[in-house]
């Protein structure tokens, strides 16, 4: 996913700046991109607030069967990213880019970008200075959750370390509106996703590496160093894996839909207790361009409640629980089909056959992804969340009074409009482990792994690494596993066998 014009304005925090450190070829035929990390200051969080000021706090998106590229529109690059250095042209013109497994195009600012502030603050590609430039001219545009770019395609040589990819199609960005790319520490983005979601169907750089025989094995892998005291930020390995980067064996799961590195995910556990949310299956995307771990509002609210994260009060949610909570509880006890409950009590206008959209709003215009402002949509989504929450508590044999009190508390923990939720830095030891089930194996995240620290000393803040993102069926429910997860687990992107592998990082 990257999640995009459907705007998930999340934006947090501490981030790792992945600058190009060193590229090296080894005897095993792999090429390594050394990564360095830098902490982001609070400017990006402020920028995100400005960018998202007019946006809705909670969103659900309906993506059609051909909506693969739509997820890109949700992407937000203002939280934390990994960067590296590449060059375009002959002689090489250097750019810092995000190595992003959640998108597939390469773009950098163009010298023909005259009126966007972002272009003035970053290096620009000058085709007239490259002897290997070939004119293309096809128009291109990409919309993100907190930003957009537009421009045209060109062809030129792209250098990644010692690898020179010939005749690579890329986008020269001539428009970068908004504040997102103004404050960004990177110049452009290098997508490592599948060609299926590439704007203009341009072959990704990774595809041409393989096609031109620059890489022996169709595999690349990420190791992200989460130790803030070490200078080395991590490593991106093209052509294989480094056994020193992980412990034990990888758990592999097949890619279920080419476009993103998407796979099936099982249940989510909080403190070892199943939530049941993904018992019937959820989809997940491994995304190096996202710092946090994003999931449906319903379950993210439960997680943030368990870790003591403070969000904003949703009056709509509390109103629904106050007026209909007991009715929902009674219907569940009478074994009414959960997906039909909200329509039965008149809060939803459908009977659940289209699938439950676990969010506060739903999008009916999939092409333009316009948000609905109807109060009815909000009440329907609040009802759907309440059904899931009450189900979860019934499985634990809680009393009716305790269940309704718990659901009211969850309403108060709904994420803030920024998507971020603060936690008490002094309470890490009391927070539960949060676990994801992938390929039948449980992958744990401890508090120190999912809580992100912004700033130092008395002004330091701790932020939950979980943010809400609602994608309606058939694409959703969808999870985005960003750096919070990939930092704990070394990740292998096996293009040849179309699978993703996870093992504990060393």
From Swiss-Prot:
Its EC number is 3.4.23.-. It is found in: Vacuole. Glycans are attached at residue 397. Residues 82-503 form the Peptidase A1 domain. It comes from the Eukaryota. Residues 25-64 form a propeptide. InterPro entries: Aspartic_peptidase_A1, Aspartic_peptidase_AS, PEPTIDASE_A1, Peptidase_aspartic_dom_sf, Phytepsin, SapB_1, SapB_2, Saposin-like. GO terms for biological process: lipid metabolic process; proteolysis. Its main location: other. Residues 312-417 form the Saposin B-type domain. Residues 1-24 form the signal peptide. Belongs to the peptidase A1 family. This is Aspartic proteinase A1. It comes from Arabidopsis thaliana (Mouse-ear cress). The lineage of its organism: Eukaryota, Viridiplantae, Streptophyta, Embryophyta, Tracheophyta. The gene is APA1.
